[in-house]
Amino acid sequence: MSTFNSYSQPKESNDNSHNNVNKSKSLLDIIFGTNVSEWAFSENALMKAMDLKIEQEKTKQQYYKLENLNRSIELFKLASSSGLPINQIHKLFNTDHGVPASSPMKAGGNQPHNNTEGTQSSENLPRLNGSMKSLKPLNMNTVSPTPMSRQPSPYKFPASSSTGGISHSTVTNVQRRANSPARIGASAVAALNDNISIKEEDVARRIPSGTKSQESPLNKKPTSLHSRNLSLPIGKFTNPNIPSTMTSILSFNRDQQQPLSQPLPPPPQQQQDLHTHNLHTIPRKPGMVQKKHRRARSTSSFGVIDLSIIDEAKEKQVQRSPSPIHSNVSVALTSHDKPIESNMKEQPNMLQSVREGRQVHDDLDDRTCSESSSRNESPVRTITKDNSVGKILNST
């Protein structure tokens, strides 16, 4: 009863003081309560109250530090008396957050700032009293790491293969790399060899069995011909359907061209013989184009003038017949001696000689790309009056 009375009296006194505090509104309640807006004291009093609150908090923190230090000393004494190894004692001061508690030797300089550590160590003390005698040395590998202290495991390379042979892992890796450059190149070479072997088999089938040699199939060359030049115009046609009388498109041989002066073309048999002679004089390889170096003569189609042709034409003209002028003179001289009947017989010969002379001149004009007026002499300019330039030159 006495204890009940002792507890009841302070309770009643606390209720009375609480009523008095609500009425008087103490300074601490005004600072840290809900009635801060109703502050009725000076500003200096408010600053003093804040300084007082700060000192109270510092006192509390110092008290918790000392309490934690005392609990740690007691725990250390209990562990040393129970025979715990020295290298395992520091694990008793580890907290749940992975931060170890300060050892007794460094307690003055490094102390935790939480009061929870002291309470946890005090809770562990009663448990250690009964089971400290049965403690055994702990193993470092058996301690499970905390979530904060856990680190990712490093990458481990596979074990090196034995010297006697290749390991199974390397074999599987080689098989998986199907698109490696070496395998791609090997497959391409294999495909190329297959194509070559197919072509060689085709060639071997065409050759008779008695003519086969003992050479290696790699040394044999395919008999396929290069057919790119067949698109060009050639003089000989390999197709039997095309007649041999057809000539090439690019043919500049003047011997094959028919002159204008001939009234009748040669017979078709002679023309065919001429073409076949020109086309088959040089031996030709099948499928290949034979190139003949021909020095192009100056013709009217090219417009090139060759002055040596003029002398040749003059010589031919002299050899064939005399000039029309001499023929006219001879006709004039003999007209007085011979009768009129002989003149009538010689007129066709004179006309023929005139035509031949004109034809020679026309051929000469065609070869030299000139006109008939070029054979006439150039007119001489006659100066009737002296010009001013001539007077100036004569005066000087």
Swiss-Prot record:
**Which Pfam families does the protein's record reference?**
DUF2722
Biological process GO annotation list? cellular response to methylmercury
First and last residue of the signal peptide = none
What residue spans carry the Polar residues bias annotation?
111-124, 159-168, 210-230, 370-396
Q: Which UniProt keywords apply?
A: Cytoplasm, Nucleus
Judging by the UniProt lineage, the source's domain of life is Eukaryota
Q: Where in the cell is it found?
A: Cytoplasm; Nucleus
* Comp. bias intervals (Basic and acidic residues): 355-369
Q: Which parts of the sequence are annotated with region: Disordered?
A: 1-22, 98-126, 145-168, 203-239, 254-274, 355-396
Q: Name one GO cellular component term.
A: nucleus
- Mainly resides where? cytoplasm
The entry's function note states:
Involved in resistance to methylmercury. Overexpression suppresses a PAM1-SLV3 double null mutation.
What this protein is called in its record is Protein BOP3
Q: Which organism is it from?
A: Saccharomyces cerevisiae (strain ATCC 204508 / S288c) (Baker's yeast)
